[in-house]
Amino acid sequence: MGPSGLLVALALHLAVCSRPHRDYCVLGAGPAGLQMAAFLHRAGRDYEVFERESAPGSFFTRYPRHRKLISINKRHTGKANAEFNLRHDWNSLLSDDPHLLFRHYSQAYFPDASDMVRYLGDFARRLGLHVLYNTNITHVTLDKDPQAWNGHYFILTDQKGQVYQCSVLLVATGLAVPKLVDFPGSEYVEGYESVSVDPEDFVGQNVLILGHGNSAFETAENILGVTNFVHMLSRSRVRLSWATHYVGDVRAINNGLLDTYQLKSLDGLLESDLEYLALVKDSKGKFHVTLKFLLENNSSQSADSIPLPEDDNDNFAMRVAYDRVIRCLGWTFDFSIFDQSLRLSSGTEFSKKYPLIKASYESKGSRGLFILGTASHSVDYRKSAGGFIHGFRYTVRAVHRLLEHRHHGIPWPSTEYPITQLTSSIIRRVNEASGLYQMFSVLADIILLKENATAFEYLEEFPMQMLAQLEMLTGRTARHGLFVINMEYGKNFSGPEKDVFYYDRSVAHIEDAWMSNFLHPVIYYYRHLPTEQDMRFRPAQWPLPRPTAIHHIVEDFLTDWTAPVGHILPLRRFLENCLDTDLRSFYAESCFLFTLTRQRLPPFCQQGYLRMQGLSSTKSLWQHGVESRLLQDYTAMENSNRWLGDHSTAPEPLTQSLDSNKEEL
């Protein structure tokens, strides 16, 4: 190699060595990016957040255009349990700081977007997160290196040409590109991102809105009171969130146009594929809707002589002229900054606007590239809340736990309990856990049984579609069977065409629990960890493969699954049947009697009484058990027997009966 070659090699070496390196690079300081930064910061990891604007949450400085968020801020629940309250707090991020709850930033049920901007700024400052502001990453590529964690580094270039090197890339840029239309006359269409939000600009106008989503209805709601009429047009039928149980569908706060449409107050809703349409502007500046094929067959250059559908069909629904046409079709992910070497592609069908990722939120094309937040919604699009703060705060935590195990050898957090605590552990989680509640059928709790079912290990909020890879992803073993705790709606209850208010829609009887419609806990039992093939060929509409046994806890109007007879007893009997054991608790006297009369003791007596632990019954404890419907009141039975002339001796009231139905609780 000559002198010039040495100089080039030296220059390249210096360029590589001068790259600032971070183990974790996060793109975007929105809610998802800050949430991941908070977890990385608390774990003491080497990370940097890159934000193109001068402050966090720049999306909320512009959107929603009419400034009202549709994520609820329920400040009062009647409960003091912080985890339970997060079920109904759709705006807070997860942290250990009680001051960083959104209820301290707004009293409104539907807050103003500026409150979210203020909240995110405080979140970053109070936690001391490492954010590099005014840094717009314009290009991302790969640099293969066998020494790197994933076999390559991610090379980021900003608007100034500065290059950064990362071992793991976490993309939390959201959906930043407005979805456009492309038909003749589309140049006349105004976009949601730029149209006026002042109702005075629409007084006495005829307005056509393209789209049937929340942004379209938000726009219509703002101008309903001043326009002549508002028509809405989209390819698909309107999807109402209370019917689909999907928070991303049209919410009641914005559906005023549906009211005026159905009550025939001039406003209207139409369905048609936009790609077949065209817009024509007449000499008065009005816009007419026509069909593309009519333009193709017309040679006239005069706007007023172009054929319209009403020429052949005089009751064509859209024969009226419009003053304005507004596009409200949502957004798509910005793929433009990613080099082809990353193989980051879009999803399929309705999820085309999202990157194609695994259920672990990792790109299918590049190991070590994870998609977070709204952009990760392809995993649960139109199913759960993964595209929104109250959903992705938990999926981001799941990704962090996966990374902690993969790169730092820290297993998925778990707690080990004796088997006697199995029923109570499940009941506690289904009644208070927020991640299970919001990310239903996406994140599930996993219970790993120990040998001989003497104990169990409890893992919270694992991505259930990755169940076959649980051991590899978590560092935990599932050799002796497992339970999966999921929250589900009834399989035939949700859909845009469903009547969810029909009479007798709820299930109240225990024996009909499997027919429950509303969100309720479902427990799956597997003797062995399902395989990839099991997951792939699971029954239609099932979130998991067919289990060894399954149990539905009957739906509850109060979402309070603590009823001793209606909820706890059926669950405990199900668990006992799966494990072939007795999960009841006993007083010391009963355990003593069992040791004299049984060859096999219940686990409670084995793990408590035989280790010199346990509780002796007293009059007050027995009375509490009777009042709680946990024990039979034998005193009352004895008095009744005496009145009937039956002089048989009733069991001692301070000792649990071996054959009492009440004792089964």
Curated annotation (Swiss-Prot):
- Location(s) in or outside the cell: Endoplasmic reticulum lumen
Write out the PTM section of this UniProt entry: N-glycosylated.
Chain segments carrying region Disordered: 642-665
Annotated Gene Ontology cellular component terms: endoplasmic reticulum lumen
* The protein's required cofactors: FAD
Pfam families in the cross-refs: Pyr_redox_3
Q: What is the superkingdom listed in this entry's lineage?
A: Eukaryota
Q: Which residues form the signal peptide?
A: 1-17
Q: Where is this motif: Prevents secretion from ER?
A: 662-665
Main location group: endoplasmic reticulum
Against InterPro entries, the record matches this protein to:
Auxin_biosynth/cation_transpt, FAD/NAD-bd_sf
Glycosylated residue positions:
N136
Q: Show the GO MF annotations.
A: flavin adenine dinucleotide binding; oxidoreductase activity
- Which UniProt keywords are present, listed alphabetically? Endoplasmic reticulum, FAD, Flavoprotein, Glycoprotein, Oxidoreductase, Signal
Q: Which GO terms describe its biological process?
A: ERAD pathway
Instruction: Report the function annotation for this chain.
Output: Probable flavoprotein which may function in endoplasmic reticulum associated degradation (ERAD). May bind non-native proteins in the endoplasmic reticulum and target them to the ubiquitination machinery for subsequent degradation.
Task: Describe the family membership recorded for this protein in Swiss-Prot or TrEMBL.
Answer: Belongs to the FOXRED2 family.
Q: How does it assemble?
A: Interacts with SEL1L. May interact with OS9 and DNAJC10. Interacts with TXNDC16.
Protein name in the entry:
FAD-dependent oxidoreductase domain-containing protein 2
Species this protein is from: Mus musculus (Mouse)
* Gene that this polypeptide is encoded by: Foxred2
